[in-house]
Amino acid sequence: SGTSGGVWGEEEGYCLMVGGDKEIYEICEPIFEALSADGKGYGYMGKSGSGHFVKMIHNGIEYGMMQSMAEGIEILNQKKEYNLDLTQITELWKSGSVVRSWLLDLLNDALKENPNLDGIAPYVEDSGEGRWTIQEAIDLDVPAHAITSSLYSRFYSRNSDSFSFKVLSSLRNQFGGHNMKKSN
């Protein structure tokens, strides 16, 4: 199955996107329910391969969401005349804001730990799902501007010194335990 939840899933439960034989799914359903977040974070997606396909697209969406969050935080960070407190802002946005989300919670946690993201290189890896999502979009003639742009931004980060890329690297570490490249 396609599985989401990162390092948090072990304690909070996972989101399981299951593909395969429907009869086997039904036999295993109690296991999926037990592993899932709130006993609801699982579902049958269809034939074999469909669960991983849905998870791949999920990760492409995640790329775009994280990129827009990183860009917005970069704009706030660059507006020096206001001396904005990014930790306070992300804490505020967690309550009632349209952009509230688990990713925002994780960004707030990262900023609480390290407000300037000191020591984090602005270098963002990709683990393949964004590339595969874009290839599917190309094959299906579906425009995927945000996902494509977010992947290309990750490529660009490898030759950059931008705060937004430190945000992205921190987010990947927060939700998935992905390695962060440390700055020299």
Stretches found by the model and what they are:
Residues 33, 40-55, 67-184:
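NAD(P)-dependent Rossmann-like dehydrogenase/reductase catalytic/cofactor-binding core
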